[in-house]
Amino acid sequence: MAVRSKSSKAWLHEHINDQYVHMAQKDGYRARAAYKLLEINEKDKIIKPGTVLADLGSAPGSWSQVAAKLTGTSGAVFALDILPMEAIGGVSFIQGDFRENDVLAQFETLLDNRPLDLVICDMAPNMSGNAVSDQARSFYLCELALDFASQHLKTGGSFLVKVFQGAGYQEYMAAMREIFGTVQTRKPEASRNRSSEIYLLGKNKR
């Protein structure tokens, strides 16, 4: 218990002193993760006015907030999560598991035959503390997201996903390269240095 308590105190200290936490509070974003997407988009311009995108594992909603601002009224943002999410202007939210037929049917109805330009995914499992198990569960979610992207993205579309480097990383990269013309890595400044998280950006879906 002492180790857990010490770790929790260290996390709380880091959180309180985190510039991105303060920026998120000031700018009205629900989580510091908003700045990761903003930085990636500044470089890669994957979201612009008119973009039609799906945000998988969207709660609490910071990526959907960013996406709604960047797509504007001419675009569309569809957010999906099994967890509840407070409403965001310009975002269509579906609560449910995106593997399930009824959820997919809702999504396809809202999409209304529009081409899907982009899928973004910042999902991570609830961590158990078992590194091997957590890594496996993380890549399972990533595989589900890749499957969704491969089925729903238009030809030429893009896919941005958070992964954790370690077991399964190279295999996942290889799977993405089979689906996308290019796959690039991104490590935004807003990612904590100690984190093994990295973002993979697949462009030009085959």
Curated annotation (Swiss-Prot):
Q: Which catalytic reaction applies to this protein?
A: uridine(2552) in 23S rRNA + S-adenosyl-L-methionine = 2'-O-methyluridine(2552) in 23S rRNA + S-adenosyl-L-homocysteine + H(+)
Q: Which Pfam families match?
A: FtsJ
The places in or outside the cell where this protein is found are: Cytoplasm
Q: Which UniProt keywords apply?
A: Cytoplasm, Methyltransferase, rRNA processing, S-adenosyl-L-methionine, Transferase
Q: Which residues form the active site?
A: K162 (proton acceptor)
Give the Gene Ontology MF terms in alphabetical order.
rRNA (uridine-2'-O-)-methyltransferase activity
Q: What is its main location?
A: cytoplasm
Q: Where does S-adenosyl-L-methionine bind?
A: G61, W63, D81, D97, D122
Q: Which domain of life is it from?
A: Bacteria
**The protein's role, per its UniProt record:** Specifically methylates the uridine in position 2552 of 23S rRNA at the 2'-O position of the ribose in the fully assembled 50S ribosomal subunit.
State the family named in the UniProt similarity comment for this chain. Answer: Belongs to the class I-like SAM-binding methyltransferase superfamily. RNA methyltransferase RlmE family.
Task: Write down the PANTHER family for this protein, in alphabetical order.
Answer: RIBOSOMAL RNA METHYLTRANSFERASE, RRNA METHYLTRANSFERASE 2, MITOCHONDRIAL
- What is this protein called in UniProt? Ribosomal RNA large subunit methyltransferase E
Q: Name the species this protein comes from.
A: Neisseria gonorrhoeae (strain ATCC 700825 / FA 1090)
